[in-house]
């Protein structure tokens, strides 16, 4: 039941962000093989994230949407945007920059969760590696197309969790936000992969 409530919250967040997921113009000059690989990676990360979410919910009982909303405000976790991916006139460079920057943000947030619990560490490590791999692939493609900025983006300010409870609550929130971000990213990549 708690997992269903969490999934409902994720869908609510995704629906709230739907204006950002408006149809894109067909302006993609990205290789099909790159797009298909990214789609596969996003689905793998989503599966890893769902597994970690279930374990966090089962282990720490922090899955009620009301708790998540309150905790989200108190922890002040940053969220990634894909606004350059949603305009009627797609900004491919801006979209790829935002995809990459969002993944870098979530890399940092996942790193901040280190030490959440010994049982969850392997699942967290896998999720972090998969996010890093996707971010690297996007960056390399941007370099190949000469779209990459002069320097790699930084992770920015990552919250410091001062207690085990905050780290566990942050884990639930970070994974939830990552799942919402990935759902939008998947829609963008799927659209770009269409002939």
Swiss-Prot record:
Source organism superkingdom: Eukaryota
GO annotations of cellular component type: extracellular space
Entry keyword set: Cytokine, Disulfide bond, Glycoprotein, Growth factor, Secreted, Signal
Entry's localization field: Secreted
Pfam families with a match to the protein in the record: GCSF (PF16647)
Alphabetized InterPro entries for the sequence: 4_helix_cytokine-like_core, GCSF/MGF, IL-6/GCSF/MGF, IL6/GCSF/MGF_CS
Keyword Signal: yes
Post-translational modifications reported in the UniProt record: O-glycosylated.
Residues annotated as signal peptide: 1-21
GO BP, one annotated term: positive regulation of cell population proliferation
Cysteine-cysteine disulfides: 57-63, 85-95
UniProt-annotated glycosylation sites, renumbered to this chain: 154
Record Gene3D superfamilies: 1.20.1250.10
Molecular-function GO terms, alphabetical: cytokine activity; granulocyte colony-stimulating factor receptor binding; growth factor activity
SMART domains in the cross-refs: IL6 (SM00126)
The family this protein is said to belong to: Belongs to the IL-6 superfamily.
Function field: Granulocyte/macrophage colony-stimulating factors are cytokines that act in hematopoiesis by controlling the production, differentiation, and function of 2 related white cell populations of the blood, the granulocytes and the monocytes-macrophages. This CSF induces granulocytes.
Assembly and binders: Monomer.
UniProt-recorded name of the protein: Granulocyte colony-stimulating factor
Gene responsible for this protein: CSF3
């Amino acid at each position: 039941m708690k997992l269903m409530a969490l999934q409902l919250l994720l869908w609510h967040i995704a629906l709230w962000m739907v204006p950002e997921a408006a149809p894109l113009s067909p302006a993609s000059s990205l290789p099909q093989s790159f797009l298909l690989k990214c789609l596969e990676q996003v689905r793998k990360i989503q599966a890893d994230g769902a597994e970690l979410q279930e374990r966090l919910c089962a282990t720490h009982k922090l899955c009620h949407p009301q708790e998540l909303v309150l905790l989200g405000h108190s922890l002040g976790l940053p969220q990634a945007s894909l606004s350059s991916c949603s305009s009627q006139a797609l900004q491919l460079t801006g979209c790829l920059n935002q995809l990459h920057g969002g993944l870098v943000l979530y890399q940092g947030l996942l790193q901040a969760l280190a030490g959440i619990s010994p049982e969850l560490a392997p699942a967290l490590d896998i999720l972090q590696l998969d996010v890093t791999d996707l971010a690297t692939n996007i960056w390399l493609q941007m370099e190949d197309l000469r779209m990459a900025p002069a320097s790699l983006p930084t992770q920015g300010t990552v919250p410091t969790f001062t207690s085990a409870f905050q780290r566990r609550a942050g884990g639930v929130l970070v994974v939830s936000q990552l799942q919402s971000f990935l759902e939008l990213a998947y829609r963008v990549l799927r659209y770009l992969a269409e002939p």
